Structure formats: C-alpha cells, structure tokens
C-alpha cells in the first residue's frame, strides 16, 4: 500500500506491521520488551538526554550551514513547515496543525519500530553468538539495507535511473549503518533504547520541519547539514564510550 502517494505523504503501513511482528518475534526468541531495552527504568531521563543531545548537534549543524550561506550571500531565511524526506531531498510543503501531528506520530512509529527491531531484537539475537561490537555490525548492516527501499521505490516509479539507484543505495547503506551504530552505542551505554530513540526522533523530525531557504532553493545543503550533525554526534559519543570502557575495564 503506497501511503506515501496519498494524503498521508509517508509510508507507514510496513512500519506498523513491523511493530506488530515484533511481539511474536520476541516470543519466538524467548525475549521480552524489557530485555531488548523497553524497560521503564530511566525512561524520562534518557528520553530527555536524547532530545537534548540530538537538538544540540543539529543546532550546531544549522549554525554552520547558515554561516556558510551568509558568507556566500545566499541565505534568504529559515522556514517552518512539514515536508516529506526523499532520496533527492525534502518534498512538499504543509503548514496545517494536522500535518504537523501526522509528521510527529509518523516519526514516532518509525522510531519505535526501527529501534525495537534493529537495536533491540536483532542486536540481542546476534549477541547470543557474537560480541556486542560484532552484533552491532550485523544488526546495523541490516539497518542500512532496510533503507534501500527508498531509492528502490524511486527506481520503480521511474524517478531514478538504475545507476542512480545503486549509487543512492550504497550511500544510504553506509550512512544508515553509521547512524544506527551510533544508536547501538547509546543503547549499550544506557542499558535502554530510549536515548537512541529520542535522538533518532530528533534526526527524522527536524529535517522535515525546519528548512533553510537560500537563493538556490530550499535545503540545498541538507546533506551537509545531516553529515555535520551526525559526524559531531558520533565523534562525541565515541569519546564518552571509550572513556566509559576504560573506566569500567569492559570487554565488549
């Protein structure tokens, strides 16, 4: 069902299906929601930390983008409206409250499903045989391949050539893997999915709501913005992770 071509402007049926399949999958593998990171302990504090963390690094990325455009004399203004993300950039422009709610709820569904499956279920299943780092590698490689559905859909719709499909797929596999690996580290460090979920939610939501208008168009430097935010976030997280690992002498 192509809900991305309807009033909703977003594909969410498969994400709802993924959430529904998560429950029997947990039962099949002898796991429960708490074991994969959905416990109630630290829920508010880790969600708050994730929201602050994600917002901080995107704020820095926006500032860098704005400074760059100002130096070139190309900045027009910032704008706030709901758009949909595609592999070729943000599309659509909706300013109604209903569309804002759809955006927020849709991103929440997406975050619950992806974190529950890739950083929760798959991570725990792989950890039965491999170390944390190897398990994170495999689960987030799958997360990367999951994101090739976007360019594949564009290819089927005739919006992208076969070459474009392969190039965009490779880029998405790599970037999604690195971002997912970051969320896996957050889950390992906090013992729950909530910080990663909150950062994931900020990542998906902010690019759909806060837009940079320049003389060249809307969100012309979107890829740069995302790259800067994720790179800074990942580097800072790695510093905390290595410091924590040394202090606890953990074998991961």
Where are each of the predicted segments found?
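Aromatic-anchored segments of alpha-helical transmembrane domains
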Residues: 1, 55-62, 141-149, 201-211
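Alpha-helical transmembrane segments in multi-pass membrane proteins
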Residues: 1-30, 38-40, 45-55, 76-102, ...
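Residue-level signature of the transmembrane alpha-helical core
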Residues: 12, 16, 47, 51, ...
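Short juxtamembrane and helix-loop transition motifs at transmembrane-helix boundaries
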Residues: 62, 97-102, 154-164, 191
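Transmembrane alpha-helix/helix-exit interface in multi-pass inner-membrane proteins
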Residues: 62-71, 136-156
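Membrane-interface interhelical connector segments
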Residues: 79-87, 117, 151-165
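Membrane-interface helix/loop boundary segments of multi-pass membrane proteins
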Residues: 113-142, 188-192
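C-terminal membrane module of polytopic membrane proteins
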Residues: 201-252
């Amino acid at each position: 069902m192509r809900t991305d071509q309807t009033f909703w402007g977003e594909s969410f049926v498969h994400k709802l299906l993924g959430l529904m399949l998560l429950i029997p999958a947990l039962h099949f593998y002898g796991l429960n929601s708490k074991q994969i990171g959905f416990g109630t302990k630290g829920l508010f504090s880790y969600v708050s930390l994730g929201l602050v963390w994600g917002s901080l690094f995107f704020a820095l990325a926006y500032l860098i983008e704005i400074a760059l455009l100002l130096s070139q004399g190309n900045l027009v203004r910032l704008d706030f409206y709901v758009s949909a993300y595609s592999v070729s950039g943000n599309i659509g422009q909706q300013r109604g409250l209903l569309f804002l709610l759809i955006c927020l709820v849709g991103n929440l569904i997406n975050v619950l499903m992806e974190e529950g499956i890739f950083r929760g279920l798959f991570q725990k299943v792989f950890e039965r045989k491999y170390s944390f780092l190897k398990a994170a590698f495999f689960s987030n490689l799958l997360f990367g391949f999951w994101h090739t559905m976007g360019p594949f859909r564009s290819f089927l719709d005739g919006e992208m050539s076969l070459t474009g499909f392969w190039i965009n797929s490779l880029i998405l596999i790599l970037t999604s893997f690195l971002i997912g690996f970051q969320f896996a580290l957050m889950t390992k460090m906090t013992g729950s999915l909530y910080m990663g979920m909150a950062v994931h939610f900020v990542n998906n939501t902010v690019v759909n709501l806060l837009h940079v208008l320049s003389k060249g168009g809307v969100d012309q430097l979107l890829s740069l913005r995302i790259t800067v935010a994720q790179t800074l976030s990942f580097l800072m997280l790695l510093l905390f992770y290595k410091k924590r690992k040394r202090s606890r002498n953990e074998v991961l």
